[in-house]
Structure formats: structure tokens, C-alpha cells
Amino acid sequence: TFAMEKAPVEEEIHFDGYEEVKAGIVKWPMSVIRLNSRNRKKLTELAEKILNSWRGYTDEAAFIFAKTDGEPHNTITPIARMREGNYELDLVLRNNITTPEHPLGVYHPHQELHHIKKENIGLIEVMGLAVLPARLKEELAAVAEKLVKGEDLRADEKTAPHADWAEEIRKRRTITPDNALQVVYEETGLVFAKVLEHAGVYKRTEEGREAFRRFVKQVR
């Protein structure tokens, strides 16, 4: 079971004409609408309506643009499951717009997280399981070792990309030979949570929630 499947709905929402479909915003770092119903036809009809609405949706105040220079940006990652005999769909709102500051994407892991994760966020990761580059196994072990020995992280090409992050960990965590690798792994998990936050089109702030509600309200 993926973490997203266990995540609860934190705010119920309603769509006119779809009273048979329970809908809500999921408590998750990315922006997710969950639909649940026994009526598969109504569920898929509403999901399609949300997808089409999102594809054409622009909200400049929230930095969401359906298109720039003719290139479409909005899409949805859908995740389907059965839950206690009901059909359930999680619709994850995505947007691939880029800017000079974020050439790989505004809603993509930002530069400061690239030492851990630079690649695109795929379906498995959206659901809460980190798929991390193989290079990290060796690199994180080297980071842990240098933290224990108090060695210079910038002097070794394996640890140099992680130096800023590791030095910040060193300031707030007690590192011992016994716990060093575990601490580094825990901190890597926190970076992955940040990766998902960066990929979320609506941030988990009051402003972000308001903007999310604006989108939901205009779905027709």
C-alpha cells in the first residue's frame, strides 16, 4: 500500500450533478482530488470533466497557465483503485511550465534538491515511494562516513554535491558512528518530501488552499 492511498481527505468538495460521487482534497504534498463512488459511469464522467477543465485552466495569481507560446502545460496523473467495494480515483494536478529560474519546471524539484533528485517525478513517486538514482547508495554512505570523521565534504567528488546539505545536518543532529547512516537516510526522506512539495501546483498554505478551491469551484 502506497502512502498516498493511506492519506485522508482533508476537505470535502462537491460537484453539482454528481451527488453519488464523494469528492475531496487529499492531505498530501502534491495537489490531489479524490473521487469515490459505486457508480463507475458517474465517477469517470466527473473525472473527465475535471481533466478537461484543468487542461484549459489559467490562474495567473497562482502562477498556473494552461498555455504559453502555444504549448499546453496542464495535465493530470490519475491513480485508480478499489476501496471497500467502491471505485476510487485520485487525480493529481500537474503543470510543466518552466521559467529562467526553474528551467526544468516550476513544479519540479528545484535546484537545491538536485543533489538527491533531479529527474522527473513519476507515478510511483507521486504516490509516495521515492525512486532515487543508484549513485546515491555510494554517495550517501560516503557522506555519513565524512560526517562521523569530521572530514571536508567538498574535497571529495562523491560528497561535494551534498556538502551544503550535510553541513546543515551536522549543525542540528548529533552524529555518531552508530547512527550516521540512519540520520543521512532520514534526512534524504525529508528531501524527498520537499521534492513532492515542489511538484505540487497548489502549496499547502492558506493562499494555496484558496487557489485550489478557486479551481474546484469553476469546474462545470
Give the ranges of each region predicted by the language model.
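General "foldedness" signal
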Residues: 15-16, 47, 64, 68, ...
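Catalytic or ion-translocation cores adjacent to nucleophile or general acid/base/metal-coordination motifs
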Residues: 1-48
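Flexible loop/turn segments at secondary-structure boundaries
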Residues: 9-11, 41-43, 71-73, 98-101, ...
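Sequence termini and other peripheral, non-core segments
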Residues: 75-78, 84-220
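Generic, low-specificity signal for short hydrophobic/alpha-helical stretches with a mild N-terminal bias
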Residues: 15-17, 28-29, 73, 108, ...
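Active-site/ligand-binding surface loops and adjacent short beta/alpha elements
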Residues: 34, 38-80
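N-terminal start-of-chain detector that recognizes signal peptides
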Residues: 5-7, 62-65, 97-101
